Amino acid sequence: MYRSEHILKGLSNQYYRATYKSMGFTTEDLKRPIIGIANAWSECVPGHYNLRQVAQRVKDGIYRAGGTPIEFGVIGGCDGMGQGHDGMHFIMPSRELIANSIESMAQINLFDGLVLLGSCDKIVPGMLMAAARLDIPCIFLPGGPMEGGVEFDGRQAEQTSSTEAYGMLSAGKITEEEYVSLENTACPGCGSCSYLGTANTMCALAEALGMTLPDGGTAPATSAVRMMKAEETGVKIMELVEKNITARQIITDGAVRNAIKACLAMSGSTNAVMHLTAIAYEAELGIKVLNEFDTLSDTTPQLAKMNPACKYSIVDFYKDGGVPRLMENLQSMLETDVMTVTAHTLAENIRDHKYLYPATGLVNHTLDDPFGYTGGVAVLRGNLAPDTGITKPGAFDKSLHHFKGEAICFDSEEAAEEAILAGKVHDGHVVVIRYEEIGRAHV
């Protein structure tokens, strides 16, 4: 019996059917499995700007496979837009709001399955947290990464290039004309930021976790593959519903360990530590994510490298095989018997994957030829971080792995930015920003 039949089947449930029919749903529509589509589309976030089109293709797939899609909206704030002002204090709590609102809508409407559409920093983990709480068939699908912009300072430009350019302008290294020109060429189209920040890390890790279809985590926002993956997602959610493969059958201790290893191997965002911790918490798992990062970092090599660690973008990573290639190269270190949203195991996905592009070896390396012999994310302990701190050694030069300098402390992000722009931060300083904690999020 489908969950939705509790309110849509039988003479006594006419009220619910009449309510849906007021919006044009037919009797036949309401006899099918009801699939919720949680869509974080907005004009506030470039990573979500294409999600209207993505949602339509997901709906096409659901209809084709015998289901009825019902779409609802989800908030989604851009971390970049919140930086440098009080708005940043609202970013982390939004993750919990997203998880709570999706859980609420799914339970109010008794959806039989969920497709989760979002791309950016707090939206991806918030959606995966909701899936883990609900434990119904779910697939997460991002809108895909933005392609790189004009060549600037040795790599394809993106949003952070504008920040760097302001410093270069202040130092007299570029002209005002060059600076203004970059504003129009740094971001050539929609998508999540083209570097490996939190957004693309979490999209890639959703795929490594098994909650996104292969290549669904990193295919570009403007690509045909993105739309193909959307329709395939619509078809596949129906298979998960029919087979009753739920989120907690996929989000297991082994799957989370695989995602941790993928994060270490690609030198992903340090924020992945707290997000994977929260996802594991919502799935009621026993795994201690921070301890696993600490232990596995010593034995997991860095196999992928991209901006900000080098000039290659997340789209270059995708074209060099993306997450499927990374997981294939890591296969001997992974728990490959875990279930995924393909309704097959990770081992079967690796075995059957068809790559669209020939391997270049520029971004994805093998175990025999790693970028580094330890993970690209590390756990720190010491007097500055008695409860641990997280760093990303895979993204900066090895000469900085040991550094001694004078600490210059600020009590807010705004104060630090003001001092930097006023020329008060110099070579040899270690910038410390206090009191910007994440509050009561599950970490």
Whereabouts are the PLM-identified features?
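Glycine-rich, highly charged phosphate/nucleotide-binding loops
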Residues: 91-100
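Catalytic or ion-coupling anion/metal-binding cores of large enzyme and transporter domains
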Residues: 1-43, 47-49, 54-75, 80, ...
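A short, small-residue-rich loop immediately preceding and capping a beta-strand
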Residues: 106-127, 139-142
